[in-house]
Amino acid sequence: MYVLKNGQVLNASGKLESKDVLIQNGKVNLIADSIEVTSGEEFDATGKLITPGFIDVHVHLREPGGEHKETILTGTKAAARGGYTTICSMPNTKPVPDSKEVMESIQAKIKETAKVRVLPYASITTSLGTDELVDFEALKEAGAFAFTDDGVGVQLAGTMYEAMKRAAALDMAIVAHCEDNSLIYGGVVHDGIFAEKEGLKGIPNIAESVQIARDVLLAEAAGCHYHVCHISTKESVRVVRDAKRAGIRVTAEVSPHHLILDEEAIPGNDGNWKMNPPLRSKEDRAALLEGLLDGTIDFIATDHAPHAAEEKNVPMEQAAFGIVGLETAFPLLYTHFVKTNEWTLKQLIDWMTVKPAECFKLPYGKLEEGSVADIVVLDLEKEANIDPDTFYSKGKNTPFVGETCIGWPVATFAEGTLVYNEGEIK
């Protein structure tokens, strides 16, 4: 049992209120002006913000098969440090969770080593990226969170349509990395100013937006919840906005780096700035910000993609796609958007908690009496530089090295257990 004393919580209107929070038996037992108990442990939250634990539906944990990049243990330590209490792990592992047996083995490893809640995706196709569909019913029974081939787009419309029909019958979501391989043209960055300057092959916007346009129509026909991963282009935002207006059940996420950076920020041919989707144009970034504010884009997800140093500390042509994000998302977003008064604090917290929970019908993301005690304590005055040497993640691949941010998680409770406190994993 813990009593969080003298903290602040956000009320429904976004105002800060001084409250104590009692955690008992993994639940939020009481929220009150003052709580006095004779047993349990007191946690001093004076001057700190107490919020629901963050939810990230887009995380690459790499295990099994990629343990040199990340493991379930190191990835969930990184999540705890970043304030995340629920993360959803992508299926681009070796082996791929395309069968009940593999899914059950991943679930067993999660139970054995994870520091926070991990909800694993199953793949849509066998081996990920084929045209043979998995056994949706068996994988749901084995505990799959949803279905995705993240890392590659499902190329054939017929394959995607059949997948959507099967997912809809089970009331489960299809989560899509949207990329038409015939429109990539071997690109490694956005097809724009930076590509031209560096003489690199570019990935055009239409590689993403064309597949989203196809898929929203398939989702409408199938009656499926269709979720767009890491949306990155103005055309994609327009397609999703139009689909929502038409009543199609589509949701979308955006990554912190696509909100903060665009192609003009890239300093040179450095593999740590290579990600998929790539950093797009200023106009694309503006459309993402507008789409998030008007509800076209539903929430924020990191696309945490750790790699070994030798896979990133090379020119872009040779580097792996992806950057890490679990340990830096909140401080970066708070610094860039809340401290600059572009967003309210409540907007940011909602986009990292209740919004993803609502989209995927998860019973988390709220701080109220009776809720699961997934809680992060935030010090909104704490200032620190982003230093990959301090990361719990095995991946150190971030373009934000050395950036000074204000507002950091200082403690994380997962189902009432203190898993992170002042720089230390418990």
From Swiss-Prot:
The active site is at 303. One of its GO terms (biological process) is purine nucleobase catabolic process. It comes from the Bacteria. The keyword DNA-binding does not apply. Keywords: Hydrolase, Metal-binding, Pyrimidine biosynthesis, Zinc. Its cofactor is Zn(2+). The keyword Zinc applies. Pfam families: Amidohydro_1. Zn(2+) 2 binds at residues 150, 177, 230. Substrate binds at residues 60-62, 92, 276, 307, 321-322. Zn(2+) 1 binds at residues 58, 60, 150, 303. Its EC number is 3.5.2.3. CDD domains: DHOase_IIa. GO terms for molecular function: allantoinase activity; dihydroorotase activity; zinc ion binding. PANTHER family: ALLANTOINASE. Belongs to the metallo-dependent hydrolases superfamily. DHOase family. Class I DHOase subfamily. This is Dihydroorotase. It comes from Listeria monocytogenes serovar 1/2a (strain ATCC BAA-679 / EGD-e).
